[in-house]
Every structure is written in C-alpha cells, then in structure tokens.
UniProtKB/Swiss-Prot annotation:
GO molecular function: Glc3Man9GlcNAc2 oligosaccharide glucosidase activity
Native source organism of the sequence: Saccharomyces cerevisiae (strain ATCC 204508 / S288c) (Baker's yeast)
Region of interest (Disordered), ranges: 954-980, 1063-1088
Protein name: Uncharacterized protein YMR196W
Family matches, as InterPro entries: 6-hairpin_glycosidase_sf, 6hp_glycosidase-like_sf, Glycoside_hydrolase_63, MGH1-like_GH
GO BP, one annotated term: oligosaccharide metabolic process
Note: Present with 2220 molecules/cell in log phase SD medium.
Biased composition, class Low complexity, residue ranges: 956-968
Alphabetically ordered keywords of this record: Phosphoprotein
C-alpha cells in the first residue's frame, strides 16, 4: 500500500519546492535571475532636464557609473531585493572593454529603434530557479565590433534591414572556411538539495572552431548593489567582501540582512596544450587557480565627469582597468571592498576543447566548503552530482506539465519558451518621490520639473518587486498588458507567481487612486488594453484544472480592484456617455492613420472600434468572474447583472447610434450605423465631430477585436442564479430591438441549450471570417496579420491641412520612427492579439457546434468548423519556430541568417521574437520577447499533439535543450509514449478554455467523452498512474483512458477500498472517518 500511496500522492521534487515556498516553509524564490540585462539608458536612471533617457546614461558609462535603481549583468543572479548580486565577465584579450553586460543600440542609434546586438539563449529554468542554464556566444578571432555596429546601423534607414552581428564575416562564422571562431559559454546554476541559499555555479566554455582560441579571461563577480550612497549609510552598516585569511580562493561576505556568507572559487581543471607533437598534445595543463580582485561599487566621477575626487579610491571599473588596461593599481591591495571577482586566465583553448569553472555561494559553509593547503575546496563529484540531479528534476517537472506524445522539436520549443519566461524575471525598483526629487546625499540635485514632468501624476508609486519583463534588454520594465499575457504560460508552471504578478498591478502602490493601472515607465498614463480581468480569470481556471486548486481569495481580491479600474474606463474614456470609447494608444502603436495617444489633427474625437470592443470584452470577463464568485457569495449575483447590462449597452452603441431631435432627446425612429460598415462588412474607427462622423476604412486588427467579446451562458448558470436570470429575461422581453439588431442569439438557444453573448451576429461573424481567413487579406502562412494585405496595393490615404497621412501594408519593420520605430502593427503577426482571436473562435464553436463551418483558407474548398479554424491558426503560428522540410525555421528567413537553422551549434536554440513578418515569418523586434511570445508554450500543450508536419511520438521523455538525440532516460517513458488522446474537438476546446468538468459535460456533443485531454491536469495524471499500477497487479495490461471522470474516480475509489480491506490499519485509523483518497488522512501515515 505504501508503494501505491506514493504513486498517488507523489509529486516531482520541483513541485515539492513550490509547495514549500507556498507554505512559507522554505524561501526557494529568494535567489534567481533577477538582474536586468540593461539598466543603462532607462527612464529610472534618467536625471536629465529634457527626459532624454537614451543619452543621459549611455552604454559607455555603465562600466564605471553606479546605477541608482537596479543592477545589470551577463547571466545576472541576485536575491529578491537585489542587495547581493552575481554575474559573469569575460575578456578574449582583444576587446576594448570587459564583457560584463550585453551591448546594443539605443533608440536613436538603431534604424528600427533600440536593438540588442549579441547572441545569447535561455536554455533551461525551473520556477524556483533550482536549476538554470543559458548560453552566450563570445567571438575570439576578432574583437567585438562595438563601433562598427553603431556605424553600420546609423547608415541605414527605415526601409533597410538591420545590420546584425552575424553579418560581419569572420565574427561568428567564416564564409570561406565555414569555421566558427567563437566560444560557447554555458552558464548553469543549481541550488542545494535542502538549502535555498546555497548556490552552485558552473561555467563550461567550448572552443567551437578549428583553430586555437588564444587567451581567455573568465571573471565571475560578486558585488553589492550600491544603496549606501543614496540612503545616508555610506559608513554605517556598510556590507563588506574580503578575502579569507587562510584560503586565497575564498571570499567572506558580511551583510546586515544575510549575515556571514562565503563564496568559493574552485581551481579549474584547465584545458589541453596545443603542442606540435603527439607527446605534447597529450600533456595535461596544470589547474588554473583563480586570482581574487577587490574594488568598490562606486562611480568613477573623475573619469566620467572630470570631478576632482571619487567617493572611493577604488571604483566600479577597476577590473576592466586591471585586465584590459593593465593598471594593476586599480584594485584594492588590501583585498576587500564591495565588489569582487575571481579571474581565471586560460592561455589557450584548443580546437573543439572546453574548460570548466566551478564556484559556490553559501550561507552555511561548514557543510560544503573545506580548507586545505591555503585553499578552500569543494567535493567536485558531489558538486557535479547536484547539477545532474537538478537537471533530471527539471526534466521530470516539465514532462509532468505536458505529458503528451508530442515531437521532440515541440518539447524543446516549449521548454525554451518556459525557460525564457523564467529568465526574464527582474527586480524592478522605483520610488517616485526619490526619483523625482533626488536623494538627499547625492549632488547635484535634479533640476525642477525635470524629464518634462514625466509621470508627475504617479507620485504614489513605490515598487521593489520581482516582476515579469517583456524582454530584459529591450524592455527592462513592466508593461501592464504584456504582463497579463505572460501570466497564461506562467500559470501552467507556477500559478502562485502568475497570481502575484496580476495582484501586484492592482495594489495601492501600483494602481492609481482613480483606478488606472500603470502602463509602462516611459509614460504610466498611456492606456493599455483592459486584459487584466481576462488574465485573472484564465489563471484561476488554469490552476484549477492543472493543479486541482481554487484560489477564490485571489479571484475576489483582484476583482474588487478591477471594479475601480472598470469605473476609471467608463468615466475617463467614454467622454460623451454613449458607451463608445476613444481609448487612445491601446498598445497597438502605429496601427491607426494618426498617433492615437495625441489629439487628432482633424479635430473631433476618435471613436475606436478596438477600444469599444475591448470594453465589451472587459465587461464579459467581469461578468464571468462575478458569476464564479456568486457560487459562494450571492452578493456577486447583483454585480453580474450590472456587467451584463454594461455589455448590452456597449454592444448596441458599437453598431448603432440613435439620432437626436432639436431638444437633444433621442429619436427612437431614426437609427444611424456607427462603427460597423454594412457595405464592407467590417468594423472601422470613426472620427466624430458631435453632429456628424466619418469612418476610417482601414482593415486592421481594430476591426477584428470585437470578436473577443463573446461568452456562452450555460443553462446551469441561468438556472442557479435566479436574480441574474430575471435581469436577462427583462432585457429579452423589454428591449427586443437590441437583440434583434446585434446581440447574437440571446433569444435563440445554441448547442447544449446555451445562450451566446457576443458583439457579432452569426452573419457578421461569417463576414469578418471571410476576410480573416483570406490569404490575400489577414491570413498568413504563419498566423494572423495585423493589417490586411489588401492595403499593400490599396493604401488608405488622407490629407489634413495639406499633410498627407497614409496607412500601407508593411509586413516587416516599421517605415517611420512613430513610437520609437521598434514595433509595427501594420502587417506583422503578433502573438497576444492572435491568442485572443483563437480563444474567441473556440467560444463561438461551443455555441454554434460542428455544423457551422467556414471556408479555410478562403478559395481552398475546405470547410472547417470554428474549433478546427482555431487549431489551424495555432498550427501556423507554431510553425514559425519549427524547422520545415528543408530544416529551416521561418523566424530565420533570409540568406544572411539561414545558417542559424543549419549550423549544429545554433539550430537547436530558438529566439522568441516580439513580432513576425506577415509574409515570411521572419522574427522582428525584440529577440528575447519571452513574455507574450511564450504563449506558444500554451498552444503546444493545447494542439501540439495533432500538429502536422512533425513526428508525433517522442523519442525521449527528456526535453532536450541542445540536441534531439534519442534517449532511454526519463520517468515512465514507455507509459507516457503509449498514451492516447481524445479526437473530439469538444475535448480540445474545453481543455484550451480550461473549463470545469461540469462545463465539459454540458459541452459534450453527440455522446462524445472527455478522454485524455492534451492538457492533462497533474492531479488526474497521478490518478491514472495509480489505476494503471493496480490494473497491472491484477494482470490487466492496458492504458487507462477514463471515459467519464466521475465513473473513473468511483472505480478508483472502489479499488482503493478493496485494497484497504486487506490491510492492517491501526486502531487510530479504525476509529476515525477515513477517506482513502485523501493524501493527508491518517490512513496514509498509519497503514503499514
């Protein structure tokens, strides 16, 4: 029974860490990849008068100037308040500077805005950061081309492709020899089995070329974020690093919060000599002992600003001065300070060889660090075993997240998407008062009304949290609508962290007192789409379905704050009180003909189809949550009725507008079309001058967003909430003209007797889909274009006061500097908006069923129901990343980057771009947008099992990160590989939308059954394992595929009870009412 009990109640080691963290038993979140990848040229570090953040703190200052608000670094790790920091520095003996942070162009330097110019990849990470792995590619044959990258990109215009590092011949690839003259620098961190504050680090550096590398300096760093210069504690309680008196490779750390800790740098085994004869080639080089260097994390004001004196004799740039400039007096000879490093000097790494560097940070050195012969040492076998164990535990964890027979390529893609999502966590620190007024101990004081008064209405902001970033180099700041999408894949692997992100943005030190959610640091006042309520409810449902937990406290707490946010929208963005909204920016940058964040050059007001569609969507999400909360608290039933009414009024106003008579009263007899264009069968924005308006006939995402606002009302919900039903019936009976005009099927029952709330009728839905699924309009081979390809030959043009405005289809980069020029919504494919369209189609399918089919693609003669259409769109977007029949990934489209798909040292590493070319799928924008582009991980779980053009049976249960070699390792590989999945589209749809079991039963069509769904819940997975185990003991050898969860659980409980009858139970267990299915019951402790 113990064996069976363990099978049922067991969890992966990583899940157990998450449980310990959730229950405050151990703080596994304490240490993680929380350093930014760019703190220079950010708004927070800008103390200029004119608000020019790009120039006020340039890259050239970063090595010698202290950051006020947060540190950055290569492979950066810190505690959750970023008091103690670690990163890696490299020098190839040729570069003009130490490589301790990633380089890129500022907004003005790039021909398409800011752009990181390095090659690096996130390969692995777990939610507790018990194991992390990343790769940086560092050239050694040539010096890193800092100046050339700036110059070449500066010579290019908006119409040109960007100049990339791999465009430089001989840097990463030699065109003549095919050689790869660079180092692969693999970084790994593994936490101790029991101690969350014992961190083990391992660097493995490969020479990928056919030539000797020459020298390489590796310098792992340990330092404190400089807080003492700003809070008046320059001498009081100042932390200290100093070399140990007995061990030359050991650093002792003293810190007010963390006490006494140590960091030991193990001698490296070295490489091999590249001698000229056989005997010399086989001769092993002696170990490389690290050299410890110390300085202070203080600005070099003398060097940067010609000041007379520095705050400290030893400054932040000391290690670069020492190694690159040869200034041996730059470091502290007393071997102490607030910044330290360990220098490993390798004179050469021969072709194809590698070297390894190991080091450890711990708050409990007595159990893991030993001193011998003037050195501190660690057990290297035990050290490497920790990494083996953590990596195996990560494999087990991710196999449990997606235990499906999907291809190795998809498993690798999903693993890297999750890893990137976790790597892009960052400590975000911002206090408005200190930022705007300056620090008391820092001179000169900031100029009055500096930065043009940026964010002056956000004086309440006080942020010091670990947040999910869109991209830690290009966007090292939170963006509220990005965060909502990040939380969907995050909830699959760490629902607690996902909930924390959504909760934080509504807390009083983030949300404005008027209810507005801050947008992003360049302008917290900008208006992002209202997707927060949707994300909150989706995360709630994902946790319920995957982990069998319902956090109603979270749902209710955030819902209360979202009531404020909804009120802010209604009061501030519906200026004429007509339920038609002029939202402004709404995250879609340049999608309109005018800058939507600024007043119209035409005068009047821009009534936005997407803004009004977003508000209808917001209303339905709030209705969803209110009905969920009303299941246990009837107070919320009244609130649900209120949001139902909001949706009804918004939906009516979006398509129709009453005229008014001379007194200003509505003339019920006269109705004008509003944002829907009956001739074009599409939604358009309109400019309103009060008494008349003009539509702007641009076919863009703006006209597709109304599809988002859809929701099915289940018969059980209508029956359960009588007050809500009464309100619905009143509208149906007393306002029939609204429903007859544009509320889809409120008086007609769909499949399963359910009702549909939607902005679009069946006729309008069909019309919109005829454009959406047309490959000459929105449908790309790789997803959904943001602007119809129709506008390639038919641009929209408008002349206002002699100025020409035009919107033309641009599948690639932007052709202007609008919004920085680094994004484009006039043709490319974007993940967040596509994700919501696909979910909307799934919801429509639940109402209309399999009989409602549309041609997909238009002109193909193939007719699909809406669930199949959603799957087809998912397949297309997944195939942005996976190799085609020629082994090439669409994201690497173009001759200059094809080698990224074919080179054995590149082809398995997947960059997650911000957006994608609408025609070719080429990756564009930020190259590590592992925020919303990580949504691909959810699609893989949803539809990966049936994804075409890929092998469906995995060769391994291990999600490889560097190879697709076959492997026999992994948990229950045979059992997992032989599992079957249900074929019913209802099951796919119910799983994708994270419906409850009750809702799934309501949605079954034609007697279909639930079966094994693509996104198996972890709790259901355990139950099936247990049933299979017991079947095998009884001689039954078959895969368990439960036809009905209730019947399945009944059978399982029966089998367990039969087992219990044959076992000896202690008296204590006999005297209590024991549920054998309860893992916490006394039975599970007392049965022998």
């Amino acid at each position: 029974m113990n064996k069976l009990r363990d099978k049922f109640v067991d969890s992966t080691v990583e899940e157990e860490r998450l449980r310990e963290n959730r229950n405050h038993e151990k703080y596994w979140y304490r240490w993680g990849p929380y350093l930014s990848e760019r703190s220079w040229a950010t708004v927070r570090e800008d103390y200029s008068l004119n608000g020019d953040a790009w120039s006020n703190f340039p890259f050239e200052h970063a090595n010698a100037r202290v950051f006020r608000w947060g540190e950055d670094g290569l492979f950066g790790v810190s505690d959750n308040k970023q008091l103690v920091c670690m990163n890696v520095a490299l020098w190839n003996g040729k570069d003009e500077r130490l490589k301790e942070r990633l380089f890129g162009l500022t907004g003005p330097q790039g021909n398409h805005g800011e752009d990181v110019k390095e090659l690096y990849f996130y390969l692995d990470n777990t939610p507790t950061h018990s194991y992390m792995k990343a790769l940086y590619k560092y050239p050694f044959k040539k010096a890193f081309p800092y100046k050339e990258l700036v110059q070449k990109n500066g010579e290019r215009g908006y119409e040109d492709k960007e100049f990339e590092v791999y465009d430089i011949d001989g840097l990463y690839r030699d065109s003549e020899t095919g050689d790869n003259p660079y180092f692969d620098v693999f970084f790994e961190m593994a936490k101790d089995d029991e101690n969350p504050s014992e961190l083990n680090f391992r660097l493995t550096i490969h020479n990928r070329s056919k030539i000797d590398s020459g020298e390489l300096y590796i310098a792992p760093q340990l330092f404190f974020r400089n807080t003492w210069a700003f809070d008046g504690t320059r001498t009081k309680d100042k932390p200290l690093l100093e070399r140990d008196a007995e061990a030359a490779n050991l650093i002792n750390m003293t810190h007010k919060k963390y006490g006494n800790c140590q960091m030991v740098f193990q001698p490296s085994p070295g490489g091999f000599s590249s001698g000229t004869n056989e005997e010399e080639e086989d001769k092993e080089v002696e170990d490389i002992d690290p050299l410890l260097l110390f300085t202070d994390n203080e600005s070099n004001l003398v060097k940067l600003f010609n000041e007379e004196k520095n705050p400290s004799e030893y400054t932040k740039d000391a290690f670069e001065e020492y190694l690159v400039q040869g200034k041996t007096d730059a470091v502290n000879p007393e071997n102490k300070g607030t910044k330290a490093c360990a220098v490993y000097h390798f004179k050469n790494i021969p072709p194809g060889e590698y070297v390894t560097v190991r080091y450890k940070f711990t708050n409990d050195p007595k159990n893991s660090i030993f001193k011998a012969q003037n050195l501190a040492v660690v057990d290297e076998d035990e050290f490497d075993l920790i990494f083996d164990n953590r990596e195996e535990e990560a494999d087990n964890f991710y196999w449990r997240i997606t235990p499906l027979p999907i291809s190795d390529e998809l498993r690798n893609l999903q693993r890297q998407a999750f890893s990137g999502l976790l790597w892009t966590k960052q400590f975000y620190n911002f206090t408005y008062d200190a930022w705007y007024n300056g620090d008391a101990n820092v001179k000169p004081r900031p100029p009055p009304n500096r930065a043009n008064g940026r964010n002056k209405n956000w004086k309440h902001l006080y942020i010091e949290d670990i947040l999910s970033m869109p991209d830690k180099w290009e966007y090292p700041f939170f963006a509220s609508w990005d965060t909502a999408f990040h939380c969907i894949p995050l909830a699959m692997i760490d629902p607690e962290f996902a909930k924390r992100q959504l909760d934080l943005l509504t807390r009083e030190w983030y949300m404005h007192p008027n209810g507005q959610i801050p947008a992003y640091e360049w302008n917290f006042n900008d208006v992002n789409p209202p997707v927060h309520a949707w994300a909150v409810y989706r995360v709630f449902k994902i946790e319920r379905n995957m982990y069998n937990r319902e956090d109603r406290t979270f749902l209710e707490r955030v819902f209360q704050k979202l009531l404020l946010n909804f009120t802010w929208w209604v009061n501030r963005k519906d200026t004429e009180g007509k339920n038609v909204f002029e939202g402004g920016f709404l995250g879609l940058d340049n999608i309109g003909v005018f800058n939507r964040s600024e007043p119209l050059p035409t005068g009047g007001t821009l009534e936005q189809a997407d803004s009004t569609g977003w508000m209808a969507f917001f209303s339905l999400q709030m209705l969803n949550i209110a009905l969920e909360l009303a299941k246990e608290n009837p107070v919320y039933e009244d609130i649900a009725s209120k949001f139902f009414e909001h949706f009804i009024l918004i939906s009516d106003s979006m398509s129709f507008e009453y005229a008014t008579d001379i007194t200003g009263e509505k003339c019920k007899e006269v109705i004008k079309q509003n944002l829907w264009n009956e001739a074009d069968k599409f939604y358009y924005d309109a400019i309103s001058w009060g008494d008349h308006k003009v539509q702007l006939p641009i076919r863009s995402l703006v006209g597709l967003i109304p599809l988002y606002a859809s929701m099915t009302l289940e018969p059980s919900i209508i029956k359960q909430f009588r007050g809500f039903k009464k309100r619905v019936d009143w509208f149906v009976n007393n306002r029939p003209e609204i429903f007859d005009r544009n509320i889809a099927s409120m008086s007609k029952k769909g499949v399963g007797e359910r009702l549909l709330l939607s902005l679009v009728t069946k006729e309008r839905l069909t019309a919109i889909l005829s454009r959406l699924l047309d490959e000459t309009e929105f449908l790309s081979p790789y997803g959904i274009r943001s602007l119809s390809k129709y506008h390639e030959k038919h641009p929209f043009e408008m002349n206002v006061n002699g100025v020409e405005y035009m919107v033309k289809y641009l599948p690639g980069e932007s052709d202007s500097g609008m919004f920085g020029g680094n994004s484009n919504w006039r043709g490319p494919i974007w993940f967040p908006t596509s994700f919501l369209i696909m979910e909307a189609l799934q919801r429509f399918y639940l109402y209309y069923g399999s009989d409602f089919k549309v041609e997909c693609p238009v002109g193909s003669g193939d007719y699909l129901n809406l669930a199949e259409v959603a799957e087809e769109l998912g397949y297309r977007m997944i195939h942005l990343f996976v190799p085609d029949e020629n082994g090439e990934r669409a994201i690497h489209y173009g001759d200059h980057s094809k080698f990224l798909s074919s080179d054995p040292y590149f082809r398995d590493y997947v960059p997650f771009f911000e957006y994608f070319d609408g025609d070719t799928g080429r990756g564009l924008g930020a190259s590590h947008q592992c925020g919303w582009t990580a949504l691909v991980a959810k699609w893989i779980s949803d539809v990966g099992i049936s994804c075409v053009r890929l092998p469906r049976t995995p060769r391994s249960s291990v999600a490889t990160t560097a190879s697709t070699e076959s492997s026999e390792q992994g948990p229950k590989m045979k059992r997992m590989a032989r599992r079957k999945s249900a074929k019913s589209l209802v099951n796919y749809t119910a799983t994708i939308l994270d419906l409850t079991e009750e809702e799934k039963r309501h949605h079954r069509i034609g007697g279909t059954h639930s079966g094994l769904t693509p996104q198996s819940s972890i709790s259901s997975d355990k139950a099936r394992h247990l049933m299979e185990e017991m079947n095998e003991e009884e001689g039954i050898h078959e895969t368990v595929v439960p036809e009905d969860r209730h019947n399945f659980e009944t059978k399982l409980i029966g089998k367990l009870k039969d087992k219990v009858k044959n076992m000896k139970v202690t008296d204590k267990a006999k005297d209590e009412d024991i549920d054998p299915m309860d893992p916490m019951s006394p039975l599970n402790k007392d049965v022998s």
